[in-house]
């Protein structure tokens, strides 16, 4: 990531006629290192691969410096049966969507970054990079997408609580804060996690019943 310094730029700040180059990293690359790969094996096989602790710290440094602008998930829900093929046959990639926010908010709770950083990397900055109309901010005329989270109580990641069809998470066993309590799309609650639902939570609407396709305008 170091060689990208002074090359990447947020589209909203781009000037001149040069190329707009944006970058992203994943919660997995900001969390795991070679010791996790040694323990978890092909569960953590992905491309680019999980590397060493000093590489992870380089990503953090360049993320906070603005060279890397966004947090993505690279969600690739391969089955455990496929992952059990071992090296090199197991496919690269892993589930990542449903733990992404809690992982990053846990990093914020632990002092690696601020809450405002997470909002920028996962909401406003992403909307900027992709010119998403009405997304990334709470403001008049926007789409009204909101997530309410619990920053006080930690819960472990359990495979049996995942929503992905493949039923596992690379973060299994990790204690995370920042779990979503309510998700609102276009002003409509679509998911909740309460004592009655248990930690897995429940969906409140049918898939596709709320929200519209994301509109992205050209950069220039």
Task: Name the predicted role of every residue range.
Residues 44-55, 91-95, 169-175:
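A short acidic, glycine-rich active-site loop
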Residues 43, 70-71, 76-153:
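His/Asp/Glu-enriched, well-ordered alpha-helical/loop segment
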Residues 1-23, 78-95, 127-135, 206-220:
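Short, electropositive alpha-helical surface patch
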Residues 25-26, 75, 151, 174:
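Fold-independent oxyanion-binding glycine-rich loops
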Residues 86-89, 143-211:
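C-terminal cap of metal-dependent C-N hydrolases
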Residues 1-71:
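Histidine/acidic residue-rich metal-binding segments in metalloenzymes
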Residues 49, 116-117, 158-163:
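Short, positively charged
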Residues 30, 80, 156:
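Conserved protein kinase catalytic core
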């Amino acid at each position: 990531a170091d060689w990208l310094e002074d090359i990447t730029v947020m589209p909203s700040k781009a000037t001149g006629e040069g190329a707009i180059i944006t970058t992203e990293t994943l919660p997995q690359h900001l969390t795991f290192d070679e010791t996790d790969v040694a323990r978890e094996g092909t569960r953590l096989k992905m491309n680019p691969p999980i590397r060493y602790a000093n590489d992870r710290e380089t990503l953090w440094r360049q993320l906070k410096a603005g060279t890397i602008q966004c947090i993505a998930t690279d969600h690739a829900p391969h089955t455990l049966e496929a992952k059990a093929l071992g090296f090199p046959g197991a496919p690269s990639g892993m589930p990542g969507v449903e733990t992404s926010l809690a992982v990053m908010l846990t990093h914020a709770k632990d002092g690696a970054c601020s809450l405002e950083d997470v909002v920028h990397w996962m909401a406003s900055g992403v909307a900027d990079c992709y010119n998403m109309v009405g997304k990334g901010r709470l403001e008049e005329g926007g789409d009204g997408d909101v997530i309410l989270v619990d920053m006080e109580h930690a819960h472990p990641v359990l495979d049996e609580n995942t929503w992905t069809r493949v039923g596992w998470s690379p973060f299994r066993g990790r204690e995370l804060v920042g779990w979503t309590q309510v998700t609102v799309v276009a002003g409509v609650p679509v998911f909740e996690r309460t004592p009655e639902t248990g930690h897995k939570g429940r969906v409140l609407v049918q898939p596709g019943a709320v929200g519209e396709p994301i509109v992205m305008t050209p950069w220039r």
